[in-house]
Amino acid sequence: MSRTVFCRKYQSDMEGLPRPPFPGPKGQDIFDHVSQQAWKEWLHEQTMLINEKHLNVMDPEAKRFLDEQRDRFLNNENYEKAEGYVPPAHDANK
């Protein structure tokens, strides 16, 4: 059975994550206040940032950067986006 959370990104009741995305208070906060949709969108953004900026996720500085960008993304604040990325156009005929 899915659970519902009031998503801080979308300011709406939405389907929540099945479990915290990682241990600790921050993981629990995300579990309690971020929808599954918002989390999936963040993972996509995170992947683009890692690839575009050639981040080594084992580097503490890169981890701090991604943590900060994640918090900004999930709180609807300005965050760094992958440079040059243009979302694909949706074809209305499909």
Swiss-Prot record:
Q: Name one GO biological process term.
A: cellular response to oxidative stress
State the UniProt keywords alphabetically.
Iron
Q: Which residues form a coiled coil?
A: none
Q: Which InterPro entries match?
A: Fe_traffick_prot_YggX, Fe_traffick_prot_YggX_sf
One Pfam family hit = Iron_traffic
Checking SUPFAM superfamilies in the record gives:
YggX-like
For whether the record's keyword set contains Lipid metabolism, the answer is: no
Q: Name one GO molecular function term.
A: iron ion binding
Gene3D superfamilies with a match to the protein in the record: Fe(II) trafficking protein YggX
Q: Which GO terms describe its cellular component?
A: cytosol
Question: Which family does the record claim for this protein?
Answer: Belongs to the Fe(2+)-trafficking protein family.
Functional description taken from the UniProt entry: Could be a mediator in iron transactions between iron acquisition and iron-requiring processes, such as synthesis and/or repair of Fe-S clusters in biosynthetic enzymes.
Can you say what this protein is called? Probable Fe(2+)-trafficking protein
